[in-house]
UniProtKB/Swiss-Prot annotation:
Keywords: ATP-binding, Cell shape, Cell wall biogenesis/degradation, Cytoplasm, Ligase, Magnesium, Manganese, Metal-binding, Nucleotide-binding, Peptidoglycan synthesis. Mg(2+) 1 binds at D266, E279. This is D-alanine--D-alanine ligase. ATP binds at residues 143-198. Gene3D superfamilies: 3.40.50.20, ATP-grasp fold, A domain (3.30.1490.20), ATP-grasp fold, B domain (3.30.470.20). It comes from Colwellia psychrerythraea (strain 34H / ATCC BAA-681) (Vibrio psychroerythus). Pfam families: Dala_Dala_lig_C, Dala_Dala_lig_N. Pathway: Cell wall biogenesis; peptidoglycan biosynthesis. The gene is ddl.
Amino acid sequence: MVKALDRSLALLKQEKIAVLYGGNSAEREVSLNSGQAIAKGLEDAGFNVVLIDTKVVPLTDLVSNKIDRVFIALHGRGGEDGCLQGALEYLDIPYTGSNVLGSSLSMDKVRSKQIFKACGIPTAPFTVVNKAEFSTLSLENILADLGGRVMVKPANEGSSIGMAQAKTIAQLRNALIEAFGFDTQVLLEAWIDGPEYTVTILGDKALPAIHMETPREFYDYEAKYQSTSTQYHCPCGLNERDENEIKSLSMKAFNATGAQGWGRVDIMRNKTGEWQILEVNTVPGMTETSLVPKAAKVFGLNFSELVTQILQLSVKE
């Protein structure tokens, strides 16, 4: 096995690797930072790397530039939802991470929640609101059915973009209007009052869990990327049994949506001690200070070793 891995690594270092980053999604700025960090990590490991901003360079140029393999660093729409993966399949260029189906199902918060529920994976109660029916709905009944406080989430956005919490009819109406600016379908999820964790998946391994703490109402875009008061704990402070349990649940959720290679699963614990899976991220943030590199470091991998392993996982046997 070791010899096979060494051989695949040697072959990868003969390839021309494109790190695709930037793009047109609402997560463009995060993607630019991820792509630059990944490219540097791969270069430090001895790979032949070229950075390509898909907002500027058309994908068809990958063929003319003789790209052998792609490391996907595009977050959100167009990069994480199966569209890019389908284009790369058509161009016959191998790539990191999940395939078309796994990417699209994981990105879609509504479909992934439906899958979790069908598979018996614990997740908070929810309902779905479509833009076309918004004006005819009883927001009062929806709020009551979900316990009086909800998280409002556009179905296909990441980095907490377009998300808000609501506990009054007016707040819910305003949050839905805001969310419909990003998507025609919105997930309403019962509010979970408890700590949030995240588990990185790398191949068949679940890395050490991270506990995120923020003084804000929830772990929103500002808490993730702008706040200096957000705290990250890894080791996460759970006992061995509880950590093993969230690792197992995270792996089940990852496999349930058809995700592959690597990713990150977000999970919360409610007041009664029950775990609630939030979502699967198939292209999580990858700056030097992002969550996945933090977990990898505790696991014993530096950043270059981490991106090398992700690239190796793209080699199909």
